[in-house]
């Protein structure tokens, strides 16, 4: 059985000990080398082994040296053998087979040279030290010491070097020791191999060989299986473990349970007479009887047989006693204890006559003991915790089952007790015990002394709580003590009202004072339920008040007489009155000072004051103290005494408060009497009950004294300034009674103010301290020069009185010193005087002249408010600036502000619309000039005359000054580098003087001069030269009768800036052809700089903004916008000139035009027709954009060469012109003009009629229309933020791309884009299916779109009509039918490209419109290396780029036209208005060249980095235009200007 493991172990042993045998052989060889046998050996072992040992050793060497090793031993060099010829042992070393000792494994060594060097250095050091020491020893004794030192040094040195000599000699024979080192290393290595082998054997035995044993075969079961064919010898344990015994059926279970229930009920009925009544429940079910005693225990018993001798079996015991305060409801009896009780009780039941009764008495006794122990534990916890000072356990006897607890403990010390001991005496006790006579009863409670409704213990529930019982007991004891105290208090003072208050915590409430109404002044007496002590409290008093604490101790003690109670109540009443006085002055400018805070010399003066007193210090006059003393006299009489203490430096004195001295003679005397109340009167005795209501009188006295002190300081400061004052008594109803009257101000007024003081009846200063400490400056006037008046018919606005009194507050008195207060009074008076001087002169002319032009809203001597204007809705507010009186001040004398108010005509009307039309007072622009004028002349008559005369024209002219931005994005991209903020202010309105204004738009400057006689002069003062063609005709159209030209023309100075401020511009000969036939100029459009004289009505009509054709404008605004648009149109056409093109051309562009002639009132240009001839076309189209003299707005005239365009009918030409006026001109975008020119050049196959139909469809859209068609003129690339024309042609002029926006209405946010390419030469619309891998971002048309294109091409080839209108009509019809719905999708409805050419080519990637370089700039570098398509085929995708369609890209021209300006909130867009360049200054980076042709079209000084381009341009990328509304064009969502 063990053969296999043994064999495996031997094999492993042989394997592991292979290396060990080799090392053993080497060791034996080394030992044999020293023996004579080794020296005599002449030949090797036949097996090749170096060593040959006898077989008796039991070990044979199976490994021999190789042939190379044998040669090594036989062929030793003579040199190696001759090195140590003197010693024969070196031959043995040469043949030593022992292994070399690795470094670090042998004994430690040190080189000989290091040892010698160390010895030499040591000797040298000793010699050096010895030489230094010998120099110090000079006497005889030193000589002896030197000799001894030399001897010692020589002996030590000789001994050291003798050791070195011995060591050197030993080195010759030291090599014999190397064999010992090798032997030691070899033995250590072999020992390690043995250890590793043993460890491996143990690991194999415990792991791999654990199961390598033969099993014990069962012969007998094998025979049974082979002979009988069955296995009958399985252990029964297996069957019992896996096969459960058979169960009885449910019916049998019910029968058995019913029988057991019958037997149990029968046996219990026999014992019923002896069952204790404590068993409240006996329940028999399922063969088990459950007996329950509430709060104690529950047992379950049964019978295990039917015979009479069957004993009761106790199944379970459950203890119902619980403790939720300490044990948290956990079981109080351990399971082992229950098991022991179960065993004892079962044995007693077996021998008992009545087992049920026996079980009850045993368990009942145990549960009662357990309940008492629980109560004791709870009491111990409370006695050691929160009630440790209030309860004490006097007795606990578990045998007698008694617990006595004392509560409300009194601790006292007695001389008989040991030092540190305290006598503990409980006032009340509670005893918990078990009655010996009542065996069936539980724990009982007895209180000492007895009282009704005391706490008990509920033992039946099982939830015992000593805390609850004590809490109920404390509540009853507190009520008992309070009732006893109530009887004591009522007996001591029968008239005292004592009420029992409180529901949860009962208290006694006593009203000490007769007028006490709040609970804060009630004396409350309560009992501490924990310790039983009496607590007295008054909320207004400190809880640590000595009288309250002493009164509470007196009530708690057993010796408290009635007289003692009355004394304490009297003290408490006095303290309460004092607290009333203290609180009454809390809000006054005084603070209570403790006596410990006073200086020593002040404390000396307080010896004369009463002991019960309050010391108050005035916060504003800190050297004055008011001492309020209380002197009790008798039982119900008290005297209040006031004393004023003045402290100056280190001296203090009392100031008497009597009634003998007059007020104006003594500053602070008679302060109390002035309040009509005497605080000290020896004849009158004031009782305490009367004194309790006099705290308000004390407050009045304090304030009165302080007022006198303040008046004293103020009068002194006024007299220092030279102002005459007089302190007088006024009427008694005036608070304070005194007023400081001002009598003389001649020394502070720089001019004669006699007229002012004739009107001034009274000027005084009163002190108002009712709510806060303020001074009221009162001025009483008669015969006021100006009073309030309003137009007739306004009943609720009555006229002002000629006699009135103004009372104005001098604020911030609390933070001001008397000097600042006096300065404020003088400033207030100076304001009155200066205002009166100006107003008095104006009042003389007001009644005679100005009353019909303006009205006085209010005049209060410090401010004048006048309403003027036609509706009296403009306000002028005038006030005097007191800061101008400061020495060296540059402030204006007068503060003049302008505002608006509701028109007087709307005061009584039910509908008020003044909020719908915000008003702006234009005189606010020149408020500074008006202030300077008033300061210079002090003439308010001239100011009011100017305001009334100029308000009407300024109202309309001032509307140009409102902030309105215009976009310059398209222009900045077109003519130069794009700026960061492509917006500029539309207008600049500058004020030169009171009569001269300048209105600037771009490089156009108009000067408006206000003249007398309601006349206005307007002239063109633009820099370098006049630019307003037809300016006189504009005003003459409004009023030809009164408009005239005044004087000679004024020269405009040349530019002072000769340096180029921008890129070089082209000269006229570079982009204009020579005019063969000069154009005849209209004399009405004459350019002049002469002033044009007109009336106010004319300028008002010219500047009155009204809503016309859906946009808000006025004639002058329309005129200036047209002049500016012509200049920008010329810049746009310059970029379309062939000569302007530089560098390689783009695949798509807007075509070339040639400017023929350009004047300030018109621009003429021409271009070739797009009739299918491509670049070889010769037919021309002639354009003229001009300023119409009748309408003073831009119009266009288009003319085709005769016979070249059959569709150029008057109807179609009218449609093209109207579209320009309503859409292209109104939107103000340069790229829109380029798209318009391209579309009007297409003439092939009746394209002019199709274009005219599209334009008419856009302009004639009604609100009921279900399909809205709009041409897209400008394309905005949201990725590159660039703009481009939406309509372009290729370089060969054979293909044109058109975009049409289709939506349900102009207001619809959802829309679709119909994008197609029109083949000019073939008049068809076609497509090409391109994969996305071939052309990026190009969408393959759907089958429905392909079918639609085929249908259109078939129709146009049959009828010969133009395919543009045919396609649009078909799409719009299907759109109305609901086949297509607007969707804002990223792909267009129709995505078409040019048809493929006969030769195949690869389409290059698409280029976004923003990436197309404008004319005159080089194409992108990356496009130059791309493969170009054939010249006859348009490059697919080069225009459209990513097929991204959104409201920002196509939202610009979804409407008929755009406003001439972009209404935008300046706070949300761009820099403030001040950052926009003003005329006359050329900012860095200006885009205009002063010396070029551009300077005549645009003011170089008005174009800065942030204000590039002309007016009217709209950026559809950054500000989306809303769609059309019912009334035409809708405006931006910001505030409209002018207001509707």
UniProtKB/Swiss-Prot annotation:
Residues 1404-1427, 1475-1492, 1513-1522 have a biased composition (Low complexity). Disulfide bonds: none annotated. GO terms for biological process: regulation of transcription by RNA polymerase II. Belongs to the Mediator complex subunit 14 family. It comes from Caenorhabditis briggsae. The keyword Lipoprotein does not apply. It comes from the Eukaryota. Residues 1531-1540 have a biased composition (Basic residues). Component of the Mediator complex. This is Mediator of RNA polymerase II transcription subunit 14. Component of the Mediator complex, a coactivator involved in the regulated transcription of nearly all RNA polymerase II-dependent genes. Mediator functions as a bridge to convey information from gene-specific regulatory proteins to the basal RNA polymerase II transcription machinery. Mediator is recruited to promoters by direct interactions with regulatory proteins and serves as a scaffold for the assembly of a functional preinitiation complex with RNA polymerase II and the general transcription factors. Residues 41-104, 1382-1540 are annotated as: Disordered. Pfam families: Med14, Rgr-1_C, RM2_Med14, RM3_Med14.
